[in-house]
Amino acid sequence: MRLYRDRAVVLRQHKLGEADRIVTLLTRDHGLVRAVAKGVRRTRSKFGARLEPFAHIEVQLHPGRNLDIVTQVVSVDAFATDIVADYGRYTCGCAILETAERLAGEERAPAPALHRLTVGALRAVADGQRPRDLLLDAYLLRAMGIAGWAPALTECARCATPGPHRAFHIATGGSVCAHCRPAGSTTPPLGVVDLMSALYDGDWEAAEAAPQSARSHVSGLVAAHLQWHLERQLKTLPLVERFYQADRSVAERRAALIGQDIAGG
C-alpha cells in the first residue's frame, strides 16, 4: 500500500519491545491512527521528541495490517516544552488530549474539526495568556458540539422553546423550560448558563469577566455533561479541577511529592 501524509497531534504513546513505541495520533484527514515508531527510544533516533504527547506534526505513514508505521516526522508546533514546564498547563493539556481521543470516534474516520479545535486549544494552553479553567471548559463544550453532544443553552433541550431557562438537566440535554423540567433538575446560579454560552461562542471578554463562583459551577456542569455521555469519568479531569490555580512547574510538583515521601519515611 502507498505511503500517506497527514497533520497530526500526538495524543499518547507507550513502549513496544526494547526500542519502539506505539503512538496514538489525532490526524486531520484520517482521524485516530495508531502507529509504530521504530527505534524511537534509541538516543540516536531521527524522530526524537517530535513524537512526544502534545506535539503537532506533519507525519508520513506506511499502512500496516493492524498498525501503521511512522516513516517520517516534521515538527509543525512544539507545544510540549511550554505545556510540560508548568503543572497546571500540563494537567489541562492532558485533559484535552484524553478528551480528543474519547470523542474522535472510530479509527480512521476523518476528524478535521476536532483536529483543528485541539491544535488551537493546545496553542492557547502553551501560550498561557488565558485562564486554564476557561480554556478547558471552552474546549470541552466545543468538542462535545462537534460530537453532537453539546448541551442546550439558549433553548429548551426538550421542546426547543427559546430561553433563557433557569433549570438544567444533564440527562435531558441541558437547559429546560419550566413546563418540561424533569425531577432532579438543578437550578444553576444566575450567570452560569450565560458563561457556558460565552465559552461555546468564544466570547472571551464576557467569559473572563465572570466571577470565580460562576466558573466553578460551569466546570462542574461541563464535566458532568461530558461524563454522562461518555459513561465514565475522564482520568485527568479531577487533577485539573484540583490544581489549575497553582502556577507550579512539573519539576516543583515532583520535588514536593518526593519531599513528602522522605518526610513520611
From Swiss-Prot:
GO terms for biological process: DNA recombination; double-strand break repair. One of its GO terms (cellular component) is peptidoglycan-based cell wall. It comes from the Bacteria. InterPro entries: ARFGAP/RecO, DNA_rep/recomb_RecO_N, NA-bd_OB-fold, RecO, RecO_C. Keywords: DNA damage, DNA recombination, DNA repair. Belongs to the RecO family. Involved in DNA repair and RecF pathway recombination. This is DNA repair protein RecO. The gene is recO.
